[in-house]
Amino acid sequence: MLNAEDKKLIQQAWEKAASHQQEFGAEALVRMFTAYPQTKTYFPHFDLSPGSDQIRGHGKKVLGALSNAVKNVDNLSQAMSELSNLHAYNLRVDPVNFKLLSQCIEVVLAVHMGKDYTPEVHAAFDKFLSAVSAVLAEKYR
């Protein structure tokens, strides 16, 4: 699915985003909750207002998991296994939500990376986030 050039583009782009995990993650979550309000049902115990400590903390976790995925791009299933178990068996998150969050992450990256978020980077990230979403949904089968 991901070729060598895709992996290179993902790693280069992620180097620019990695130091902004909390900020970008929180922004992606707020975008998701705004664009897809049904996703709020998975967070009944959270203060969902933009900038809340819970949103910022979870945003950092989400992008931290993506950092792990970038580092382990050739072994996503093993790297994301624990997270897949958590979302499938404990949290019971509908897998469609992974795609919704992926879209929001792509928007945040595009906004903040500007001209560095080229069509090639976009295509590589789209494939990468699709692969991550598929791995997270593996345990549902």
Swiss-Prot record:
Keywords noted in UniProt: Heme, Iron, Metal-binding, Oxygen transport, Transport
GO function terms (MF aspect): haptoglobin binding; heme binding; metal ion binding; organic acid binding; oxygen binding; oxygen carrier activity; peroxidase activity
Domain of life of the source: Eukaryota
Binding site for heme b: 58, 87
Tissue-wise expression: Red blood cells.
This protein's GO CC annotations: blood microparticle; haptoglobin-hemoglobin complex; hemoglobin complex
Pfam families given in the database record: Globin (PF00042)
Domain Globin, residue spans: 1-141
Any GO BP annotation: hydrogen peroxide catabolic process
Xref: InterPro entries: Globin (IPR000971), Globin-like_sf (IPR009050), Globin/Proto (IPR012292), Hemoglobin_a-typ (IPR002338), Hemoglobin_oxygen_transport (IPR050056)
UniProt subunit comment: Heterotetramer of two alpha-D chains and two beta chains.
Function, as annotated: Involved in oxygen transport from the lung to the various peripheral tissues.
Family to which the UniProt record says this protein belongs: Belongs to the globin family.
Protein name in UniProt: Hemoglobin subunit alpha-D
